[in-house]
Amino acid sequence: MRLLMLLSVLEVCWAQYNPHTRYGQTSIVHLFEWRWDDIALECERYLAPNGFGGVQVSPPTENAVINNPQRPWWERYQPISYKICSRSGNEHEFREMVKRCNSVGVNIYVDAVVNHMCGKDVSAGISSTCGSYYNPGLRDFPAVPYSGWDFNDGKCKSRSGEIESYNDIYQVIDLGHEPIKSSEYFGNGRVTEFKYGTKLGTVLRKWNGEKMAYLKNWGEGWSFMPSDRALVFVDNHNNQRGHAAGGPSILTFWDARLYKMAVGFMLAHPYGFPRVMSSFKWPRYFENGKDINDWVGPPNDNGVIKRVTTINTDSTCGNGWVCEHRWHQIRNMVIFRNVVNGQGFTNWWDNGSNQVAFGRGNRGFIVFNNDDWALSSNLQTGLPAGTYCDVISGDKNDDHCTGSEIYVGSDGRAHFSISNTAEDPFIAIHVDAKL
């Protein structure tokens, strides 16, 4: 009885690190600023069939309506109550989304804002997504209800006791030189590893003398948190706009060629639990090195979010939505990760520069060329003999491949050729893409 009780306690203590996706699903996607009804439809028509395990949704709670600037993306992070009522939809639509997504095996993960309420610079009134009254200056949020007695000024080590100036407070994004460490949050669950996208972007941009060859010990070897504690990502809604952590090294959809390589590497490598970004476009305009339009909100008609209903013939999105998760290279790497789940990191190869390759046991193999010259090498894949479809250049349709084919010999070796001018200078093969 004591042994069983101890095992039960240990199981509960470790449960917070399990993302609880369905068996065999190994990644999630952030559908940033999507409507609840569009997310429900996307779960059914695309995410579930392609092996995505879950969706991170934008904050669902009632927020202040900001009109200067006009309806920015960050108004979602100015809560005035915990009513499920935002420009993504109401509580009924949220419930239906969860029900429909769960019914096809896709989980919903909420970006919950619990650290703060709407800032005091926002005027009092009922200009909110659900019409509730609020007075930030008096810290009066009766729809919660919160009053000034519910706030903790003394615990904020800043000049004002509040967080309107980020220069006043400790940065909780741990880039390795902050007084607050990511390990302090391990008790709550997996923690976002911001160093991941920052470092990977620096390597792929070849800044500061970095090379892909140095990625052989990627993960804890780069002073990241333990793999089973980490939620990893190339970019997020914040740092793709130059905010928060990362700076100019962060790769985004604006850098499509390198971005696809970065996401491909993330999904092929066993470190951490990955989150794919799905964005919307905005009219970037730089003055003195700063994008003065970084506030722009999602595609909308008079404040109402546009439906993600324009799906192009290549399955990508229109109507102002980028939908990186629908790029076939990224979709196929989500599938790749599912196929190689549980396999080790094997058969590393590099040329000492920016041509690298590695396998995932006997289930998958990937090759990158980020050099300024062509790659042509015979490499040990660890895969069974046969002909494989490269899932970056195409898809396996029945017994045919719409892209390049790779032949693996009886010794597990295969020849790979990748031009340095290729639109997608990487190749990925796995056992489910065997012809």
Report each predicted region and the residues it spans:
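Acidic-and-aromatic substrate-binding clefts and catalytic sites of carbohydrate-active enzymes
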Residues: 32-41, 63, 87-90
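Short, intrinsically disordered, charge-balanced linker/junction segments flanking boundaries
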Residues: 97, 155-179
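Aromatic- and acidic-residue-enriched segments that line the glycan-binding/catalytic groove
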Residues: 65-78, 115-164
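Glycine-rich FAD cofactor-binding loop and adjacent beta-loop-alpha segment at the N-terminus
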Residues: 79-85
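Active-site-proximal N-terminal segment of extracellular/periplasmic enzymes that hydrolyze or transfer
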Residues: 34, 50, 121
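Classical eukaryotic N-terminal signal peptides for Sec-dependent ER targeting/secretion
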Residues: 1-8
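Active-site-proximal helices and loops of the catalytic beta/alpha 8
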Residues: 10, 14-27, 42-48, 52, ...
